[in-house]
Regions:
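Non-heme Fe(II)-dependent double-stranded beta-helix
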Residues: 1-16, 20-114, 120-122, 159
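Short loop segments at secondary-structure junctions
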Residues: 23-24, 106, 135-139, 150-151
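Glycine-rich, phosphate-binding/catalytic loops in enzymes
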Residues: 38, 130, 163
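Hydrophobic, well-ordered secondary-structure segments
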Residues: 82, 117, 128-132
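Short, structured patches in soluble enzyme cores that scaffold and shape functional sites
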Residues: 100, 116, 133-137, 146-148
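Short, conserved beta-strand element in jelly-roll/cupin
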Residues: 122-139
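Double-stranded beta-helix
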Residues: 139-176
Length: 176
């Protein structure tokens, strides 16, 4: 199924900072699951395994693996990822910053904390897109939650370690 991004999607993304695009990458889910399985079996040296007394299962985070995991590379270069990003940003070109993989076991009890992606990155700018593609169903209590308009707040949300809630930066006053 090929889904075309429409003007309403673009307007929602630009006004709200978020848009749900159901089914856009549905034909890629099986490929991405194979890549995720490969990633879990052989995490990179950048991988983080989060531990917390409330976590009941594995919580693995890994990134920048698209060169090592062929399924990720295939998705990045052969799906509509770039054209979808380009449409949403109203841009003639896009650049890949990185891939980011989160693996939470089904009953891990690991909620996704409130956050914005930009404070974690070593880049700045307004024309950025992050795609969240769930490969399996999860309980709502541990799923990603989005706050429309948060990209227009006066301060960014303080970036923290997801396991310890410790700030990434010393200057916490710069953040909410």
């Amino acid at each position: 199924m090929k889904m075309v991004i429409n003007q309403s999607d673009i307007r929602s993304f630009n006004e709200d900072g978020v848009v749900i695009l159901r089914g856009v990458f549905s034909e890629w889910i099986e490929t991405l699951i194979k890549g995720a399985e490969r990633n879990i079996e052989n995490p990179s040296e950048r991988a983080l395994t989060h531990h917390h007394e409330k976590y009941k299962g594995q919580f693995l985070e890994d990134f920048c693996n698209w060169r090592a995991i062929p399924e990720y590379s295939d998705f990045i270069f052969n799906s509509s990822l770039a054209s979808t990003a380009s449409s949403l940003m109203k841009s003639n070109s896009v650049q890949l910053f990185h891939d980011h993989f989160f693996y939470k076991e089904t009953n891990s009890g690991v909620p996704t904390p409130w956050h914005q992606d930009m404070p974690y990155y070593c880049v700045s700018g307004q024309q950025t897109v992050s795609f969240w593609l769930p490969l399996e169903s999860r309980e709502k209590s541990v799923s990603l939650k989005l706050l429309a308009g948060s990209h227009q707040l006066n301060k960014e949300i303080r970036p923290t370690s997801w396991a310890s809630n410790e700030s990434f930066y010393e200057d916490s006053e710069a953040f909410m």
